[in-house]
Amino acid sequence: MPRVFGDNMVLQRDLPLPVWGKAAPGEVVTVGFAGQQKSATADAGGQWRVTLDPLPADKTPQILNVRGENEVVFTNVLVGEVWLCSGQSNMEWPLDKSANPEEEKAAATFPEIRHFKIPRTSSAFPQWNTKGSWQVCSPKTVGGFSAVGYFFARELYRQLDVPIGLINSTWGGTAIEPWMSPESAAASPKLADLQAKILLQSSHSPEGKKRYEEYLANLTQWVAATEAALVQDEPVTEPPAVPWPAWDNPQATQLYNGMIYPLAPLALRGVIWYQGESNGSDDAAAYLGRLEALISGWRMKWDQGDFPFYIVQLSNFGRTSEDGKTWTGIREAQVDSLTIPNTGLAVTIDIGDSKDIHPKNKQDVGKRLALWALAGPYGKDINPSGPLYKGHRVEDGKIRISFDHAKSGLLIGKKENLAAVTPDPGAKLRWIEIAGDDRVFQPAEAVIEGGEIVVFSPEVAVPTAVRYAFCQDPAGANLYNKEGLPASPFRTDSW
């Protein structure tokens, strides 16, 4: 049986439940759970699969029994909501290292929240299984949980009162490319550059085989030259670089193969995704193409339709990349991903840390992701998003900006640590700029009028463009809707 099946697991409610494994060819395997008995016969390769009928949420611990020539019994199994948490370090970041860890751990007696952590696994080939085990949430265990995942789960649990299962498949410092499926990368016309890289890193493609053969030839020459140099007591040169990646530097598709592929087709509700820092030099179009392909590939693998895929937008942070590029392109791509069906975006531009790429406030990140889930598959009548740029028009030397998700109105707010956003009377809108045809942006004034802002500057008589928080580290960005959710950075131009 795959390790994702185990004691303390949560099965997804209200969806067909695939259960699969390996046995001797021709062996009959029977799966029993919650009064159901389903059987399958292992094929010539030993693979078998049954699909249990959908079940309602159930907090009562039950037994999942799998019986063939041998018997496997999983205990303390609940039925509720299952979410996959993936990305790089800010999703991986444990509660132990987040804000108020001791207080949060002491209050974490939620035995119906469960967490499955997949070890870092990079593979050139799709893996059938993974390692890991399900843990019951308690003050003793929660410190190692994904902090974002835990606060997301806690909010869902409080609102839905059903068991919540989290699958934590993360690897700090990784770009998006290792998380993509080979099929989705190959199918996208936008990813020709990535397709070439995949071929080069594979020893089974003609391109990759040639690369390996060249390396072996160079290595042979180096060994001979080194032996001669040692005899003559001469300096030794560096050996040729190996053409495959180091263990801690996974390449395109390799984390999908090792950490995502083994999970499907386990029924789940959706995905929460926090990644992008390691693609910080990408422009918006390049990253968006990869994000589209990643989402498409995962949905294709699960074959559950367009399941929810909720993304954390990169927060403010003070350091730019070595090439001088900022995260503005990644943030734009993350906004543009909302054109993909059944996606959502948790904006965090107000809760970053200028000096730390790992901001400690994971509580608000989890809550903001949970708003999308509550408004989406769980049908709550709430606004899940902060203001998102909709359009603009020039009028009387000013530019009027309109927003989606601002029906309640806009406010200039103040966010301090974990406290709720409060109005900041008398404060001015920060990080707002305006430019004319010369494309030179000047600091601007802004007036809120309902769900719109009117932007102007005496330095720009004939304005053509506005930008808000459009830089690497707009610390103190303070535009919110009246639900207390921050506006995403935006620009009206494409310069």
Predicted regions and their residues:
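Cell-envelope and extracellular/periplasmic
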Residues: 2-495
